[in-house]
Structure formats: structure tokens, C-alpha cells
């Protein structure tokens, strides 16, 4: 069974569960309860059945019916499916609890499972042999198993838990017990009785146990059926699981492929990882190096930052020092210049040569005393024991060498580099050592060499702060001609090229075409100067074996730039060795030497004239009298520093020339050039001054114009304000007058309508009278006095008295009717009263206002003035006392019209048709009057015309009535003052026409 069970197991090792057959235990119990007195011997052999459990939890072992070699008992025993430990995980809890209880209840069956007692006396205690409990768990742990006797085991094994099987088992047990009882009756009867009693009791107990087991068997049977159903379900689940496993296998296969692919990728990634790892190692090393570099860079950055900060601080300090240096340099320059100015811009040094060998042999004595030379004083003894004292800036005795002479000259070299023009020249009698002082010899260098050496020394010291460019040129003035000594192939005295002095734009004199050699060190500069000096004209005279026959002039141009502030300077250094003055009588010069001496003396004389003019501060300085002075104009005209070496001879035979030279030097020393400055062209300066004067004059004129324009603007603004105020007042007054005019027009229209109606009624009454009624004769219109009011009835004035207040002006005086009548009568009786001036008043309703044929009065209102005659139509025709009293009211209207509108009296005196015609004429007149407009002039035009009217009024005072008219103040129409009476008459006609238009407008 173990082999079969193992053959039906899984592939791997499985845990075998060995379960004792519970049926055999039940059979043994039955057999123990059956029988008589004879003991029952139970075989020790026990029937066991071992079932191998599968490894899988889902697998439930079962016994196949068709297995070969299996006994019927095994099949019968296997028909009842017993639970195994392998199923405990999937078996319900109630089944496991029942099995455990059954095992505990089966425990008393061990009494029947002992081995068979041997033949002989009975053992004191019954032994039940062959009973052994044995069980094997899935994990190999032994469990107790019960082995009943063979008969009981076989019966129980074939029972399966059913009732039939139990009955058959009990019968076989009884048979067996009976046989055994007979065999052992003789030996163990007593013992068996005891055992029998015990067995009976045990029988009952076993019976009860058997019943319990049967009940439990039924229960187990039901549980087995349920387990089979569960097994079927598990099989179906197993099939599903197998299908699922197949699908999982397929999926696993796909996963395997995927895994292989991923493995391939993993291999590739591994290779890449290895490569990356190697690269990582390289990068790690590089990163370490970079870290070192970063640390170094950080340290370097810190160092650089420190240096930058230090540089910034140093730069600030440098700027401060630069500013201080610039200020100190400027201050030093100013102080140095002031020091030179204190000493004198023109300084004179006197140097005396020693006596030569010939003079010593001749026994010549010294005429110059140098006792006070340290104080700058020099004493010259004359022929007649007279002494003359000269004072100079420095006096050098014959014993002093070149070095001591140059010690006093050093400051001028510094002035050249500071940007000032410097001129150093030697003056004196021929043979007094001028060339030696200026040029010297190899062992004793002169002023020229030492000055250039000092220039280059200072230039080297200032290197980095200043940049200098030095050029050198050499020329001579020979016989009043300029020669360039640096031109190659030039012979002494030859005039290869004619050079002239020109004035450049900056006011500096320059010689165009002059060779200027640029030099960078002392050797080059001295070589150029020596080249020019060798080409100088030198001749032999009685006074000197090597006499200079020309003025040798070395020009050193210095252009400097201050690298600190960019300031640029341009200066000039003249080193001049003048030719010596000669006395022709003493030297006995002839021919060419005489001409040279004359030109030399001429140029020196011109230099003396220039010095004299400078000393006396003359307005005109004769620089152009000589080429020498023309060249030295920019060095002697006040914008340079000048040093003069006056060379004298100590020989008493040369006292005259010595005194001349010393006197000339004294005059030079007395010149005050003032502060050094840049020279400006005089013509240009005068032109600039003229332009400045014109500009100032133009500025003054412009200021005056601006002032006058400001005053004009202020006055115009004041006038504009006044005119604006006047305009506002006039506008307000116009509004008031317009309102008043509307009211007056309405009242006038009503009054005129009433009068017209009365006139028509009166005409109708007159037309009804008989023709033989006396009709007053009327005089012709031309013979009537239009302005007379003698024939006007007083009743008419009384009728029209209502309109007196209506047409009065509040701003003008009005007369009462009685007063007007008295005035009218007085004027009629007194013809001279017409010549009296009349006031400009508004006309009242009485007729006396028209008795004076004066000009229309000035009105202060824009309201049209009503005419008296315009309000007197139609009038009744009273009985006339004179023919002049027959004037009709319409004649009064026509009398006021100076326009072409004239209405005949016959038109009014006509019949009924004539009245309609008159009405139409009056309506047309009224329509025309309504179309007229009142013209309001602007304030400016009115102010402009007021002056003209004032003049016209003055001229018009003598034009009316043969020179007796009043003053007329025309307002509407300006009157020309040159017309006399004609202008006044013209103005009167215009006023009358305007008033007529106003009267007709009132009728409407």
C-alpha cells in the first residue's frame, strides 16, 4: 500500500499520512462483548492501511477500486473515505473536531488489542495483544494507532459504518469467542469469570460506545458524502486551476521570452553599465581634478578679488595722488614761474674773459673790478680815474668755469619743459668769448650742451608722466639773410634757398622750409647742433682770428603731453650766439668783411632799438627792422623768459666797447616783460576787439529795444484791459438801450398811428368843403424856411407834449416847451444868436431846436433820435397868417430827407386815391428804415478815430455861419480837418441822412 500510495503521489516528495482503520477497532470491541466464559484471544496482527497524501493542498487522496493486489477488506475499507491530515487545511472545522473526539473515544479499545496469552496459567491481568496505535502525520511524526484482532478488524473494515456490517461482525465475534472459550476452559475459568464480569461491564460500555460510534459513523458517512461533493467541486476547481495553470504556463512562456529579452537587455545594460562605470571612474577622477581646480580657482578668485580690491584701493589712492600730483605740479610750476618772475623774466648775466697771452705780454692791465661780483655789481675804471658801477643778476669773474656759469642757467631748462618759451643769447664785443660761453670746448662744455643735457635728464625723470617730442633746427642770419645750416651741400656764405619769417595762426613766428631734425637723446641733438655750427660763416679779422661773421641760432622745439590729465604744451628754446660788434676803424675791415661788419652792427643796432622800445614801453616795437629781431619777436615780446650773457673784455684798451656792452645790458635788464603768456596776433586781436565792441553795442541796442517793447507791451496790456472794461460797459449799456428802444418804438408806433388816423380824418373833412372856400396859398418848397417854427401853432406842441418825456434822454438835459418857445423867439429877434456855440444835447419836441442851423449834436446813446418834424404829421391846416404857414406835415418829412425820396405836396392833398398812395409811400419808407442797421465800431477803431475827430472838431469851429459856429465833436463820421466849411457841411449832410432814416424808422 505504501508503494501504491507513493506511486499515485505527486512528482516531488510527499508527506504520507498513515491513518489507522477505525473499523478494525470497532470489530475488536464487538468481539470482546460477545461470548461466554471463555476468554477471547485477539490476534496481535493488526490491519493497517496507509494512504499517501499529495504535496498539494488541493489534492485529496482516494482509493481506486481497480487496483491490483488489493484485498477485499482494503477495498471495503477504502470505500469509506477517511479524512487525512493533508486535508485538514481544506476540511471544515466540524469534521476535524468530530475526528478528534472519535480518537479519544476509541482509546478504551486498547483492552482488546493486546497479544494472545501463552498456553498455561492465566496471567493476573488480561492482556489484549496486538493492539497498537500508530499514526503518521504529513510531516512524518508518528501517531498512535489501534490494532484490533483480525476478526474484528476484518469485520469492522468491511462494515463501512453501516448496520448490516455491524451485525455480521457481531456473529463472527461470537463464534470466535465460543471456540476460544472451549479451548481455555480448563485453565482459566476463574480468571475468565472475573474477566468476564469485567468484559460484560466493558461490553455495555463498548455497546454504548459502539452506538455512539455508529451514530458517529452515520454522521461521518454524511460528512463523507459531503466530502465527496466537495471533492467533486475540488476536482472541477482543480480542472479550472489546471486550465488556469495552462494559461499561466503560456503566460509564463511569454514571460520567459520577455524575461529572455529583458535578460538580453539586462546584459546590454550591464555592458553599458560597465562602460558607464568605467566612464564614471574617469569622470570621478576628472571631478576630483575639477574639485582641485575649483579649489584652486576659488583660491585664485579670492586672491584675484583681493588683488582687485587692492587695485581699486590703489587706484583710488592713485587718483588722489594723481590729483594731488597735478595740483602740486601746477603749484610747483606756478611757484617756479613766480620765482623766475621775481628774479626777472629777462635776466642779464655778465661774464668777463681772462687776459690772453698777447695782452699779458703787452702788459695790459684790467679795467674791471670784481670785488662785489657776488652781489652782482661790477666796477669799470675809466681812463681818467673814473669809476662806473653796473649791477646785473649775476657777474662771473674770469676765474669761474663753465659749470658755475651753468648753475644759474639750469632753471631755464625746466621752464622750457613746463611750456614756456626761453631765449638764451650771448652779446658782446668780438673776441670776448661769446662762442666759448655758448658752445664751449670738449673739456669745458658750454651753455648749449649743458642745457640740452639738462632737458633730456628731466625728460627721463618725467618718463611715464609726460611724453615729449624734441626737434632741433640750426640757422644763421648772415648779411640780413636767413640760411639753414642743416641743408646738405650748403657752402659757407652761399644762399642756396631764400628763407623768410612767417607768422602762423597761433601768433608764433616760424620759418617755412626750415629743416627740423627730430632727436631722442643727447648724442643725436648735439650731433645736429655741431653739424650746423660747423657750417657757420667764420672769418679772420684784425681783432679776432676766428671771428663769427653771422648770428648763429639754435632752435629747440619741445612738444609735451601730460599723460595724467592730457594737457599739451608747445615751447621753444633759442640758443643764440650773436656776432660781435665791431668798430670798423679799429678792425680796418674792407670789402666783404666790411659788409659783414656793417650788417652785424645794423642787426645789433636794431636789437638795441627793440630793447629801448621795450624798456620805454612804446606802442610800436620795431621787430621787423632786422631779420634777427624778427626771429626773436616771440622771445622778446613778453611771452617768454630771456637770459642774456653780456661778454666783456678786461683789457683797459677795450673800455669803450665794454661800456657800450654794459650799458646795453643795463637797458635790457630794465625791461619788464610781465607774466608769461601765449602771444596772440595783433590784427586778429583788433578784429576780435572790434567784433566784441559791435556785439556789446548790439547787445545794448537789443536791451533798449527789449525794454521799450516791454514798456509798449505793458501799455498795450493796460489799454487792452481798459478797452475790455469799456467794451463790457458798452455791451451792458447797449443791452439796456435796446430794451429801452423797443419800448419807445412801441409807444411811437402807437402815437404815429393815431396821428395818421387823425390826418386822414382831417383830409376827408377838408375834401368835403365847398370849392369856393378860401384856401390858403402855400409858398413853394424851395422858398420855405424848413427850420423856421414861427408859423407852427402852439396847440400842436401842446398836443405832442405827451411825447416829451418819452423821447428824453436820461444822460442829456431836455428843455420844457415854454423855455424852448422863449429861446425860439429870442433867436428869431436876435439874428446874432445863431453864431453862438450850441451844446450837444438831445433835441426836444419844440421847434426852437431847429431854428439854429448848426451841425447835428453828439449823442451819447445808440438809440435813434426822433426828429421833431417826424412827429408832426399829419397836421391840420389852420388859417394861415402868412403864406409860409401852409406847410403840410408830409412836407416836413420830405424836408428832412436828403436822399432821393421826395414827396410832392400835391400827392397828399389829392382825393381818396391820393391818401392810399401816401399810405403806400409811408409804408415803403418805414420798411426801408427797418432794414437799416446800427453799426457798432470796435473800441480800437473808435479810439483811433477819436483823435481824428478831435482834430476835425478844432478845424470845424470856424466853418459854421461864416466862422461863428460852435465846437463840433463828430462821433459817427470822421471829419477831415483840411476841408474847412465843406467838410462840416458834408458831415452835416451825413448826420441829417442818418437822422432822417431814424425818423422814418420811428414812423413804422
Curated annotation (Swiss-Prot):
Bias kind Polar residues: ranges: 995-1004
Pfam families given in the database record: Kinesin (PF00225)
A single MF term (Gene Ontology): microtubule binding
InterPro entries membership: Kinesin-like_fam, Kinesin_motor_CS, Kinesin_motor_dom, Kinesin_motor_dom_sf, P-loop_NTPase
Biased composition regions of type Acidic residues, renumbered to the chain: 63-75
Biased composition annotated in UniProt, kind: Pro residues: 115-125
Cellular component terms (Gene Ontology): microtubule; microtubule cytoskeleton
Residues the record lists as binding ATP: 428-435
One Gene Ontology term from the biological process aspect of the record: microtubule-based movement
Record's keyword terms, sorted: ATP-binding, Coiled coil, Microtubule, Motor protein, Nucleotide-binding
PANTHER family assigned: KINESIN-LIKE PROTEIN KIN-14Q, KINESIN-LIKE PROTEIN KLP-3
Record's protein name: Kinesin-like protein KIN-14R
Native organism: Oryza sativa subsp. japonica (Rice)
